[in-house]
Amino acid sequence: VVESRGEIFTIPADKGDVRNLTASSGAAEREPAWSPDGKFVSYFSDVSGEYRLVVEAQDGLTPPREIALDKPTRYYTPAWSPDSTKLLYTDTNLNVWVMDVVSGTAKIVGRDPWMVPSRTLAPSWSPDSRWVAFATRLDTMYRAIVVANADTGQRRQITDGLADAMYPVWD
């Protein structure tokens, strides 16, 4: 799945036709993500005037589902949980969100309190879909890695904060 000129396309790896999932002139669809089970594509769309999260069956046989997002802002980096039940994304206000795809309920599981250049949260899912790891800036201006429970939002800093720690990856 790719984004080009505000449209979302699926392109087969081997044979088949390129398909425009959005075909929405005058709107901007961006940041597509394919679910790990291969059944769904998600992306952000402003066709309604405010950005919404769209979840669409990759086969295009059912209408896309638009999910209203909490606050008018810009959203980034959608990532499906490994079990394809949740989406992780960030926003302009440096919040880390987890959304249950079935219910459309989203909650903030973390944030970076400092609006500074090179602000990156770099969230990532644990292989069992239970935890989210991300970088957050401390009062010292170093970044630390925090893990948050995807269901409860309970957080724990796992690096000491004595040096920058960024881009968490799970083993």
Where are the language model's segments positioned?
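A structural motif specific to WD40 beta-propellers
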Residues: 19, 64-65, 107, 156
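Alpha-solenoid helical-repeat scaffolds
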Residues: 1-20, 28, 42-43, 49-51
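A generic structural motif
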Residues: 11, 44-46, 56-58, 99, ...
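Residue-level detector of conserved, well-ordered beta-strand and adjacent loop positions
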Residues: 22, 54, 68-69, 110-111, ...
